[in-house]
Amino acid sequence: MNPIAVTLLTGFLGAGKTTLLRHILNEQHGYKIAVIENEFGEVSVDDQLIGDRATQIKTLTNGCICCSRSNELEDALLDLLDNLDKGNIQFDRLVIECTGMADPGPIIQTFFSHEILCQRYLLDGVIALVDAVHADEQMNQFTIAQSQVGYADRILLTKTDVAGEAEKLRERLARINARAPVYTVTHGDIDLGLLFNTNGFMLEENVVSTKPRFHFIADKQNDISSIVVELDYPVDISEVSRVMENLLLESADKLLRYKGMLWIDGEPNRLLFQGVQRLYSADWDRPWGDETPHSTMVFIGIQLPKDEIRSAFAGLKK
């Protein structure tokens, strides 16, 4: 039985998540999609906006599914599986829409820490929507708005028809998250091929989306930022493990996501790793072949000790 692919929609209040969700549900993509959404307050509004195109909508109220009501999220996920197994509903993809003030971190961890959920669901990717009109002000005022960008596998820039292309904002987003490509979306209309099957939580060699350019952005502007570490020499596997363990011991609470491709001394294959906060995995990938071996790592987090991290990896050079 193949696991059910899960897409998480995040983004600050008014960024356009429900508009995008409505577009997803009305597209002729051939998927049977279940939806979990959550709202502040007693009554859901978005389920009235979405319509009845989803197989089943679970509306979670009275708190964020991503933080204070994580048990309720687990119950909703298990309830969907129970109804699926009983034949009451059919779906082959799940979309979770987080409320605008929610931290995606705990919901991501749910899919790795719950025995049944990690077997039956596969977290495919995190899609962050960013309002081009208000994003700078929101990110200046609310660290959570930066955090949502930091967790993303894809960043969708909305309202550029009003704000323009917002090149400085793109630079800022790249500084926060060096591994997520940025796409423009107007009124939720976007090729779903860019949103589905992103393999955001699979071990892969594409660690950094592009070489970010940061000359527009001052360090003090973002609480959350990316650190890209590149090494042109092999590293000992036990030594790099020690560095990673120390990093997690000292900064796990500050780390959002991290990925890497490592050149391990004496090994013909590249080693890939990826993690979310304290949870991470690693595995051997294909041989280097004719490619020049190298290591590339990206760490995304809150006020990370950049100099210490770079120094720790630089110390691995023999």
Show where each model-derived region lies.
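Flexible active-site lid/hinge loop adjacent to a nucleotide/diphosphate
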Residues: A132, D136-Y151, I155
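Short amphipathic alpha-helical segments
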Residues: D92, D223-I227, S295-M297
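C-terminal engagement modules used by replication, chromatin/transcription, nuclear envelope/ESCRT
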Residues: D290-T296, I300
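C-terminal accessory "lid"/substrate-recognition subdomains
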Residues: S147-G289, I302-K318
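Amphipathic coiled-coil/heptad-repeat helices and related helical stalk/stem segments
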Residues: L73, Q141, A166-L169
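Nucleotide-state-sensitive switch-loop elements of NTP-binding domains
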Residues: N2-Q138
